[in-house]
Design a protein with these regions (language model features):
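Helix-coil-helix junctions within alpha-helical repeat/solenoid scaffolds
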Residues: 1-226
Length: 226
């Protein structure tokens, strides 16, 4: 970001804003995502970059959904998805669909979220773009539980699948998320020791980033399980 601003190259700044916003989204830093997304929207409108112009609404919508404005967030994410499709760009679509599914989850619309995730998982399978597959399965499990407590067996299977894929990818942050979701389910089922023993070694692997939402959530759950 600093270098892009120093050289005042619009396209480089556009790329820097996008990847900064994406990084903040991975870290679940909602306000930072919104700030980067809104800054990118202004730049992209000024410069007329069709591809990058789709980024602003997409990530701003995700941030709004996490700040009590889920309906507006869904509308913005949907707008961003349409703008991406108009450019013909398909790479990254499973991740973008995951943002929409998560917003539907916040809105309490589990059926709509599951429909979106089915599309995302199908795309991941057909295109081979699997880097966000652990999160897709984790979200699917969460939405199944939101839909009905009767779905706990299927949800647990989704969490296990997310965990296995994350381990195979050596994606520790996604492994932590999947493990936290599975451990939370086990806690609700009365399997407190199993939940603790699963989550503790994953959490203890980290040596930094303890200010991030995922690590805070994992630590809070471990404290409950202690």
């Amino acid at each position: 970001m600093t270098l892009a601003q120093q050289i005042a190259h619009p396209f480089c700044l556009a790329e820097a804003l996008f990847f900064a916003a994406m990084l903040h989204q991975f870290r679940r830093e909602v306000r930072a995502v919104q700030e980067r997304a809104e800054a990118s929207t202004i730049l992209f409108q000024e410069q007329g970059f069709p591809l990058w112009r789709a980024i602003g609404p997409l990530l701003r919508g995700w941030a709004l959904a996490h700040q009590g404005q889920a309906q507006e967030g869904i509308a913005q994410i949907t707008e961003g998805l349409r703008a991406f499709r108009a450019t013909g760009v398909e790479i990254g679509r499973p991740w973008r669909l995951a943002l929409l599914a998560e917003a539907y989850s916040i809105m309490g619309q589990s059926e709509a979220g599951l429909t979106i995730l089915m599309e995302a998982l199908t795309l991941a399978e057909t295109t081979g773009e699997r880097w966000c597959e652990p999160e897709l399965y984790r979200l699917k499990g969460a939405l199944l539980l939101q839909q009905s407590s009767d779905h706990h067996t299927e949800a647990e299977s989704c969490f296990h699948h997310a965990l296995d894929i994350a381990r195979n990818q050596q994606a520790k942050s996604l492994e932590l998320r999947a493990t936290t979701s599975l451990s939370k389910l086990w806690q609700q089922q009365g399997k407190r020791q199993e939940a603790h023993d699963l989550l503790a070694p994953v959490y203890n692997w980290f040596s930094e980033g303890f200010d991030t939402a995922d690590l805070k959530n994992a630590k809070a759950l471990l404290d409950e399980l202690a």
